[in-house]
Amino acid sequence: MFAVSYRSVLSGLSSRASALRRAAFGMLSLLAAGTAGAQNLPQSTTLTNGINTGGTSYLDGFTRTTPGWAVITYLRQSSLDAIKDSRGDDVPVFDRPRIDSTLLLTQVAYVTPYKLFGGAVGINTLLPLINLDASFGRNSIASLRDNGAGVGDLTFGPYLQMLPVIRNGRPVFSQRFEIDAIAPIGKFDRDRDLNQGAGYWSLVPQYAFTVFPTPNWEVSARINYIYNFRSERRPNLPPGFEFRNGQAGDAGWINFATSWEVVPDIRLGVNAYYLTQFRDNRTNGQRVADTRQSVFYAGPGGVWRMDANNMLFANLYLPVEVKNAASGNNVNLQYVHVF
């Protein structure tokens, strides 16, 4: 999910063509260099893609409540073949864009022996490895340079897993509260357009729950909010621009999934996520107009409970509506092992 300011790209066409290639990216985020309105104000920062958009789905409100460790491995392949403007139309300066990214993320969670409000206190850490590969058609006026393979930004924070509600001998509801910080330790090259690291700190509170209306049917969701702090790390901006700081607008999103147990230990269902950015991005303290991102993805998925300690999730996400972002298909695999 690459954020993009098409207005900046189009305005950059009025200068030399090389300036179009100096578009700045946060983690998997397209920041097109150029001007907005009459202020000659380039977009310097966008919403990081180092967030959980569709990474979690079925049975999300559950995790272990007894002290111990769990390791979760995520594999996500994204094949993006369109770059959309603020109206959801293709940005015309990009001919046959193709941005492939492979994400291998390792999450380590530890449930402590401590209790709070009746729930189990735990700690999360997540570290991604990301490979980027971008290509464009021969007639593309603008193109983007990827930063190859490298480490992404680190996510860490505490969570509170509440004990499941039991009715008639079975769980009917479970919930979790969590707050994460994203630390900008990822690979970042100011001369590249696609980077693994976003270059700034973020704070992400979230709430996950699962409801079982019937023994076989579950509904899960995770509600998220992200606040992004200012960045003083200069991205790939036009030459001569005096950069002081940039800040991505805050955003909210929801991961939603529902599944049915078709045979014992195997569930099939649908999964989706919707994200909207509440405020425009800012450069040097000034708002850059029409830079808010909005995306809606949905698709099929399933989960296999292999045994008491191992589960495998699979999700396909297809674009339904995308604005100010790159668009394409995403495939997720998630493996959970509890020690």
What residue ranges belong to the model's regions?
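Cleavable N-terminal export/targeting peptides
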Residues: 1-46
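Surface-exposed strand-loop-strand hairpins of Gram-negative outer-membrane beta-barrel proteins
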Residues: 40-50, 77-103, 143-146, 190-195
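Transmembrane beta-barrel strands of outer-membrane/channel proteins
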Residues: 45-49, 71-79, 123-129, 177-183, ...
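Short loop/turn motifs that connect adjacent beta-strands in outer-membrane beta-barrel proteins
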Residues: 59-68, 80, 113-121, 164-174, ...
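Residues on the lipid-exposed face of transmembrane beta-strands in outer-membrane beta-barrel proteins
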Residues: 60-61, 73, 106-110, 156-162, ...
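Outer membrane beta-barrel transmembrane domains
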Residues: 76, 84-92, 232-339
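Residues that define the transmembrane beta-barrel architecture of outer-membrane proteins
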Residues: 98-106, 148-156, 173, 197-203, ...
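Detector for outer-membrane/organellar transmembrane beta-barrel domains
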Residues: 172, 178-183, 189-283
